[in-house]
């Protein structure tokens, strides 16, 4: 007959941490740490094995265009540059500052161009006001007898135009110069033209704002390369700024 054993909760034997008295020996590795280290080691070994197989199967006489810009040393190892060890790809701190200054000047030039276009478009952009043209008369009789065509000296077709309203003399002069009065640009066309200019001004404004942000970011990066103690500040919105320690200038 099988022996009956109570299936009760047994005590969990957990791995302990490094004792305080042995803390000078460093971190005490547990089993889960060993598993991670072993998996990483085997992953790297598998990658190296695949690379060795590819190198073994590669044809040494195979031609490829990169041969013109590369060569091997005495041990058969590839050198990334024609000049070998004579060429140093790393830049000094002064060279990095100079490059960032040149980039910032280029962005500043583009921003000035956008500002000029924005100012020019804003001067040309003048929409018609939504107000009414109020005319004052001396008496009620004159108000009843008032006719806008006679007051503005124009035709009934041109009365409703608050801008580009031509008088009868101007219309007669256009007709005498073999111009048709109907060739004058209508109000709807003028509004469409101004709306197009408004969209262009809006695009210039957006580009100028983007270039301004880029210029500020590049100026901040260039300032961070300089010496001096600084403190990184992050506000509630996540915006990052830096504050330098005050120094007395002589």
From Swiss-Prot:
One of its GO terms (cellular component) is nucleoplasm. Component of the ribosomal small subunit (SSU) processome composed of at least 40 protein subunits and snoRNA U3. Interacts with snoRNA U3. Interacts with EBP2, FAF1, MPP10, RPS16A and RRP14. Keywords: Nucleus, Ribonucleoprotein, Ribosome biogenesis, rRNA processing. InterPro entries: SSU_processome_Utp11. Pfam families: Utp11 (PF03998). GO terms for biological process: endonucleolytic cleavage in 5'-ETS of tricistronic rRNA transcript (SSU-rRNA, 5.8S rRNA, LSU-rRNA); endonucleolytic cleavage in ITS1 to separate SSU-rRNA from 5.8S rRNA and LSU-rRNA from tricistronic rRNA transcript (SSU-rRNA, 5.8S rRNA, LSU-rRNA); endonucleolytic cleavage to generate mature 5'-end of SSU-rRNA from (SSU-rRNA, 5.8S rRNA, LSU-rRNA); maturation of SSU-rRNA; rRNA processing; translation. This is U3 small nucleolar RNA-associated protein 11. Belongs to the UTP11 family. PANTHER family: U3 SMALL NUCLEOLAR RNA-ASSOCIATED PROTEIN 11 (PTHR12838), U3 SMALL NUCLEOLAR RNA-ASSOCIATED PROTEIN 11-RELATED (PTHR12838:SF0). It comes from the Eukaryota.
């Amino acid at each position: 007959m099988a022996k009956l054993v109570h299936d009760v909760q047994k005590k969990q034997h957990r791995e302990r941490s490094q004792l305080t008295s042995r803390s000078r020996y460093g971190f005490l590795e547990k089993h889960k740490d060993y598993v991670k280290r072993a998996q990483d080691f085997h992953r790297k070994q598998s990658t190296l094995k695949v690379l060795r197989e590819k190198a073994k199967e590669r044809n040494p006489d195979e031609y490829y265009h990169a041969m013109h810009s590369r060569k091997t040393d005495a041990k058969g190892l590839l050198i990334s540059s024609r000049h070998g060890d004579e060429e140093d790809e790393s830049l000094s701190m002064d060279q990095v500052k100079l490059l960032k200054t040149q980039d910032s000047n280029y962005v500043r030039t583009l921003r000035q161009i956008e500002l000029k276009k924005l100012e020019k478009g804003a001067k040309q952009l003048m929409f018609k006001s939504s107000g009414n043209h109020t005319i004052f008369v001396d008496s009620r009789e004159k108000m009843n007898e008032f006719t806008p065509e006679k007051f503005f000296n124009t035709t009934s077709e041109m009365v409703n135009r608050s801008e580009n309203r031509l008088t009868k003399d101007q219309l007669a002069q256009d007709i005498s110069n073999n111009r048709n009065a109907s060739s004058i640009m209508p109000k709807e066309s003028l509004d469409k033209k101004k709306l197009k200019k408004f969209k262009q001004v809006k695009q210039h404004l957006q580009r100028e704002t983007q270039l301004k942000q880029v210029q500020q970011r590049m100026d901040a990066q260039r300032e961070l390369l300089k010496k001096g103690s600084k403190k990184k500040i992050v506000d509630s919105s996540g915006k990052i700024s830096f504050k330098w320690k005050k120094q007395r200038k002589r």
